A protein has these predicted regions:
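Alpha-helical bilayer-embedded segments of polytopic membrane proteins, i.e.
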Residues: 1-9, 35-36, 67-72, 103, ...
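A hydrophobic, helix-centered structural microdomain
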Residues: 256-321, 361, 433, 438-453
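Short, glycine-rich, amphipathic interfacial segments at transmembrane boundaries or analogous
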Residues: 164-166, 224-228, 234-237, 295-340, ...
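A short, structured surface patch at a secondary-structure boundary
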Residues: 334-397, 439-447
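N-terminal hydrophobic signal-anchor/signal peptide
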Residues: 1-6, 56-58, 111-276
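Signature of alpha-helical transmembrane segments in polytopic membrane proteins
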Residues: 1-124, 153, 453
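Membrane-cytosol interface motif
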Residues: 66, 70, 125-143, 293-316
Length: 453
């Protein structure tokens, strides 16, 4: 809401400065084209994560995202007003005021966002929070709360029931051993919300102690739900089969799945048709750059564990008939700055242009635009052995992009894929058309930054 106000205030100031006074009739002539432009700007801000509390901090990450968004917004403004014919609707050309509007907006927007981040990060009104119980997820959650004060929680203490207390972890947080005098401890620290780990619920005595605290206006939430809300992933160590029975409903998603299939088909058909113009150029550069076929064919695991074939533009040096590069090394996950990639292949992978042929897989229904990554059978066998509930990723179709790819990127180890499965399960539980659009928009941001591998 604040951004919208700043947009229109900057327009009013620009027109006032330009015409030496505010004229409502002039404002009316500008309102339609600039409103269209501002809608595009807001989408650009969203793509660059400027509405995520995770980066609502005055640091380099936020500044770089803000600068990129403003540059792209400015360039699109120039295209709209100077290149697209008739965009100014004829009567008066708002493009004469565009530069002034952009300058005023940048100053106001930059100041407003930095003030917002400062206020949110330093607000004294935070929820005093305690974690009851101690496990790896509790530690990760504690680190997340400490690192992101703008989320609105102040972690006061952790209470755990272990004989030994490792002070190398979370040295800045008060850690209390044992659950004796639980109510008095929470009241003394003025805790208003307690996050409870699954282990605590195994003790009937502890449950009674927690129950006795309710009358003192202390709210209790389980670690799994709070962890999910803060990190946007599902903690594998805190769930079991019952979690899937309670949270993963296929029946309630039937209308969504039908609409998603229609959306996938038409969007993939349009993009594939448009991209065909570039295929001959891409194919020629691939052939000139290195020996081997233009396309690379590979088997992947799809919905329900069913194998299917994907086709990609070859981006690596080929040493087998399928365009692969693993004849000598065997199956190997892609890694950052992969030495197997050709010079042009690095560009294809950075921009994800190597995946253009996979639009056909979306059209025929093997894939979707959004979903878990389709893994190779060789890696699938290893990962499902080491990662709990790994196969549950295949409850839905794999995607060209996905929540795990957005939040974590590529994973080249079991530990990486453990993290990605947690994001995949979050998506499967919360998937919706709006969520899909959000992921698609954020994928565009990754492509613009050359974030492929």
């Amino acid at each position: 809401m604040g951004d919208v106000v700043i947009l229109y205030v900057s327009l009013i100031l620009a027109l006032t400065a330009r015409y030496r006074g505010f004229d409502f009739s002039v404002f009316q002539k500008h309102i339609i084209p600039f409103s269209i432009l501002y809608t595009v700007w807001l989408i650009i801000f969203y793509i660059h994560n400027l509405y995520d509390l995770d980066i609502a901090k005055n640091n380099i990450e936020f500044s770089s995202a803000l600068i990129r968004a403003l540059i792209i917004g400015g360039l699109i403004s120039v295209v709209f007003f100077y290149i697209v014919p008739g965009f100014a609707f004829g009567s008066i050309t708002p493009k004469t005021n565009l530069l002034l509007n952009i300058i005023i907006f940048i100053v106001l927007f930059y100041g407003w966002r930095y003030l917002f981040n400062f206020v949110v990060g330093s607000l004294k009104i935070k929820i005093n929070t305690a974690i009851i119980g101690y496990n790896p997820q509790a530690i990760e959650l504690a680190e997340e709360l400490i690192k992101n004060p703008q989320l609105g929680y102040k972690l006061k203490l952790i209470i755990k029931n272990h004989e030994e207390i490792d002070r190398t972890e979370l040295p800045e947080i008060k850690i209390i051993q044992g659950f004796k005098n639980l109510r008095e401890t929470l009241q003394q620290e003025k805790v208003s919300m307690a996050i409870v780990t699954p282990e605590v619920y195994k003790s009937q005595e502890l449950i009674q102690n927690l129950f006795d605290c309710i009358r003192y206006k202390i709210d209790f939430v389980n670690l799994s739900d709070f962890y999910e809300n803060i990190t946007k992933k599902i903690p594998l160590a805190a769930i079991n089969q019952v979690w899937f029975l309670e949270n993963i409903s296929q029946k309630n998603k039937q209308a969504y799945e039908t609409f998603k299939r229609i959306f996938d088909f038409f969007l993939a058909s349009i993009l594939l048709t448009l991209s065909l113009l570039f295929w001959p150029i891409i194919a020629l550069i691939i052939k000139l750059g290195s020996k081997g076929p233009v396309f690379y064919r590979q088997t992947r695991i799809g919905q329900g564990g069913k194998p299917f074939r994907v086709v990609k533009f070859r981006s690596m040096y080929a040493n087998d008939q399928n365009g692969g590069c693993e004849k000598l090394t065997g199956p190997k996950m892609a890694e950052e700055n992969d030495p197997r990639a050709t010079n042009f292949g690095k560009f294809l992978r950075k921009t994800r242009s190597d995946e253009l042929p996979q639009l056909w897989s979306i059209i025929i229904g093997d894939m979707s635009f959004v979903g878990p990554r389709a893994e190779r059978p060789e890696f699938h066998q290893e990962l499902k052995t080491h990662i709990p509930f790994y196969q549950e990723r295949y409850l839905i179709k794999p995607g060209l992009s996905g929540w795990a790819q957005i939040k974590y990127g590529y994973g080249s180890s079991v530990a990486d894929n453990f993290e990605k499965v947690q994001y995949d399960l979050y998506y499967i539980k919360n998937r919706s058309f709006i969520f899909d659009l959000s992921i698609i928009l954020k994928t565009i941001n990754i492509i613009l930054k050359g974030g492929g591998r």
